[in-house]
């Protein structure tokens, strides 16, 4: 017997048990947890946990038997992007370069649409000092993220809490187990695809969101409802994947490389997991066994 391994796993179980006490009101959904393995190898299985970027995990995900087993029997944790390790880099990338401001990118008509949205949900004008300090130099994509959260929170008070996200929840698990944390996407690739993409396209997407508020809210509601129903395919269909198809394909390759090194616990947004072209299907296509 490998006493050191047994001792380490025992320590992990103790840490998980202590955390379970603190979240004893939660209920785990095994259908959001997938076991991934390669039939041709003797490597221990890895696991993928579906997450949702707008929901507070407290009350949705907890340490059930299946999840405790997955966390105990894996040796590292991977997210879509290791945002914690590169927090400052990502925050800097959200800001417009060369002294540009968001107002300078928007036409008067587009500014009017943004003002109407902010007045409805924040009761402030975009030109106010508070809003300018908070949003004035953000890229349209970064502002879009915040506006999407604002729209969802305003219509679902208590369901989203920026201090309790899925990534934060599972990062705490990794920290308790002294595990390595990594990202499926390199931080530079993530930044380039998200905040440094064509500004005109970013503005167009922001304006589309502002002009179609009811439709956008319906998409978010459907995705969240699908997540609660543990249906990643419907979640993916509701909003579409949040990343490009080439990125999903790169992730599928990275998952296989990482899990071949050591058993890994992956946390990926449900919208990126489900669907005919989602990460789970790409892994199946590559010969991986995907089990609920």
Name these PLM-found stretches.
Residues 17-19, 24:
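Classical Sec-dependent N-terminal signal peptides that target proteins to the secretory pathway
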Residues 3-16:
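Bacterial N-terminal signal peptides that target proteins for export
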Residues 38-239:
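Structured, acidic catalytic/metal-binding patches in enzyme active sites
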Residues 238-292:
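A cross-kingdom marker for long, charged
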């Amino acid at each position: 017997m490998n006493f050191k391994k047994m001792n380490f796993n025992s320590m992990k179980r103790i840490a998980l048990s202590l955390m379970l006490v603190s979240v004893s009101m939660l209920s785990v959904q095994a259908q959001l947890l997938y076991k991934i393995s390669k039939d041709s190898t003797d490597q221990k299985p890895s696991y993928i946990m579906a997450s949702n970027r707008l929901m507070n995990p407290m009350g949705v995900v907890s340490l059930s038997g299946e999840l405790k087993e997955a966390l105990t029997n894996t040796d590292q944790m991977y997210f879509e992007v290791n945002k914690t390790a590169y927090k400052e880099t990502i925050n800097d990338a959200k800001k417009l370069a060369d002294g540009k401001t968001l107002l300078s990118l928007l036409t008067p008509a587009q500014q009017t649409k943004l003002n109407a949205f902010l007045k409805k949900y924040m009761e402030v004008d975009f030109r106010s000092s508070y809003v300018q300090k908070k949003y004035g130099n953000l890229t349209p994509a970064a502002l879009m993220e915040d506006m999407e959260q604002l729209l969802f929170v305003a219509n679902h008070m208590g369901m989203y809490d920026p201090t309790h996200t899925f990534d934060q929840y599972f990062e705490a698990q990794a920290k308790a187990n002294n595990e390595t944390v990594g990202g499926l996407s390199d931080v530079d690739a993530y930044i380039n695809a998200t905040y440094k993409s064509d500004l005109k396209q970013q503005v167009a997407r922001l304006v589309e969101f502002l002009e179609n508020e009811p439709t956008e809210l319906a998409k978010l509601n459907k995705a969240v409802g699908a997540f609660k129903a543990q249906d990643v395919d419907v979640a993916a269909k509701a909003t579409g994947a949040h990343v490009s198809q080439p990125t999903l394909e790169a992730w599928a390759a990275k998952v296989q490389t990482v899990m071949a090194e050591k058993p890994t616990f992956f946390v990926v947004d449900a919208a990126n997991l489900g669907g005919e072209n989602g990460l789970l299907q790409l892994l199946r296509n590559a010969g991986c066994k995907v089990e609920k």
